[in-house]
A protein has these predicted regions:
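Residue-level recognition of the GNAT/N-acetyltransferase active site
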Residues: 89, 94, 127
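Conserved GNAT acetyl-CoA-binding A-motif
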Residues: 115-126
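Conserved GNAT-fold acetyl-CoA-binding loop/helix
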Residues: 26-48
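Conserved beta-strand in the GNAT
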Residues: 60, 66-75
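A short beta-loop-alpha structural element at the N-terminal edge
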Residues: 9-23
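Conserved acetyl-CoA-binding loop-helix of GNAT-fold acetyltransferases
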Residues: 93, 99-112, 139
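A conserved beta-turn-beta hairpin within the catalytic core of GNAT-like acetyltransferases
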Residues: 77-88, 98, 145
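A short helix-loop-beta-strand connector motif used in the catalytic cores of GNAT acetyltransferases and
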Residues: 48-60, 87
């Protein structure tokens, strides 16, 4: 567990905590207008990120015993650099708790996990219209990628 200040704890998500996290995962998915949000599917999908995991890790931020945010990382690779990277695929802070440094603390905790794995870098993306997130990301010292992403529906 990583204690940030006197009141914010960030730790890997455990099986019992996953249940408490499901509504927040659904809120994150709703923010990005995901279709067909179902707790059972989310439970099965995100269970694979509980430590120890070969695919990634979920961490959660707690303040006074209350869940206030989470991040989900995927172990990733860069073939152009022949290195391991970490993809922070999800970062979400409860709407009522935004602007309190929780998102920044979660990013820093993800960076710590990535460093601990010997990863070359931590990477993430957001939508072009999520200006609030972009302001946070721009303030972390991270550089905007020059890559353009594509998605092919299957």
């Amino acid at each position: 567990m990583k204690r940030i200040g006197a009141e914010l704890d960030i730790e890997p998500v455990t099986e019992p905590q996953l249940e408490a996290l499901l509504p927040m995962i659904a809120a994150y998915q709703g923010f990005y207008e995901a279709d067909d949000i179902r707790a059972e599917r989310n439970r099965e999908f995100f269970r694979r990120f509980l430590a120890p995991s070969d695919v990634g890790e979920m961490i959660a931020a707690w303040r006074g015993g209350e869940l206030v945010g989470y991040a989900c990382m995927y172990w990733h690779f860069s073939s152009t650099r022949a290195v391991e990277t970490v993809l922070m695929n999800d970062l979400y802070v409860d709407e009522a708790r935004r602007g309190q440094g929780i998102g920044r603390a979660l990013i820093e905790a993800c960076a710590d996990v990535a460093r601990g794995r010997g990863a070359h870098h931590l990477e993430w993306a957001t939508t072009p219209d999520n200006k609030t997130a972009q302001r946070l990301y721009d303030s972390t010292g991270a550089e905007r990628s020059t890559w353009i992403e594509y998605e092919l529906g299957l």
